Design a protein with these regions (language model features):
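Short, acidic loop-to-helix structural element flanking the phosphoryl-transfer center
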Residues: 40-65, 100, 104, 111
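A solvent-exposed, charged loop/short amphipathic helix patch at secondary-structure junctions
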Residues: 32-42, 147-149, 153-154
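Generic detection of intrinsically disordered/low-complexity segments and helix-coil linkers/edges
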Residues: 37, 49, 177-178
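Conserved, ordered domain cores of eukaryotic regulatory proteins
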Residues: 16, 32-34, 51-85
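C-terminal cap/substrate-recognition subdomain and adjoining C-terminal extension
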Residues: 61, 72-196
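Long, acidic (Asp/Glu-rich), low-complexity accessory segments flanking structured domains
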Residues: 1-32, 187-189
Length: 196
């Protein structure tokens, strides 16, 4: 029997508290000595979460990686290109693939990936991103450049995703671990109809 692969929708990039990348907006760097004198636009400094490349490589050994971000493609694509140096992300979904609900905009509806959600997982630092499928979501601690020793990807998420890849249905395991339907209800969002 061959190894089963569990599709995994990993949200990373774009936003103030990203899953895999940290951003800092600021003034442009000082001009080079031979500057043409034209004003420069602001720039964004990107900090990769520690272990990001190893995490993506190891996950790709047992899961199909899909990047699903609420970021606009023109902005997010260059960041994702940088993040995915080994080309392990199979598909990229940007803001036009998100939906608006009565509670939030830019929600990632996993039903666009498959009608059968028993083996689909979304990892996101913003739980509201997966409010339509709370039983498929793994809330991730946000990353910022001020956390150079962050081990969330390799120590916390990788073992959990490996464990989930062995399950016929990830939702009961994720419910036991995170109780996301109750979390959404505490935040005023009903989750009826999203059960296993």
């Amino acid at each position: 029997m061959g190894k089963q692969r569990a599709p995994s929708a990993a949200a990373a990039g774009g936003g103030r508290d990203p899953t895999g990348l940290g951003f800092r907006r600021g003034p442009p760097p000082p001009p080079p000595p031979e500057c043409d004198g034209k004003p420069k636009v602001n720039y964004v400094t990107v900090f990769e979460r520690p272990g990001l490349h190893e995490f993506l490589k190891r996950i790709s050994e047992f899961a199909n990686l899909i990047l699903f971000t609420a970021g606009l493609e023109d902005y997010a694509r260059p960041l994702v290109d940088r993040m995915d140096k080994d080309n392990v992300i199979g598909e990229r979904l940007y803001r036009p693939s998100t939906v608006s609900t009565e509670y939030r905009e830019h929600v990632k509806d996993l039903s666009c990936l498959s009608k059968n959600l028993s083996r689909i997982v979304i990892v996101d630092n913003n739980p509201f991103s997966f409010l339509l499928q709370p039983l498929n979501g793994i809330p991730c601690v946000p990353f910022s450049a001020g956390q150079p020793y962050d081990d969330q990807l390799l120590v916390v998420l990788l073992p959990l995703l490996k464990h989930l890849s062995l399950q016929r249905d990830v939702r009961p395991v994720l419910y036991e671990r995170f109780h996301m339907p109750e979390w959404f209800q505490m935040h005023g969002i009903p989750t009826s109809g999203n059960g296993v």
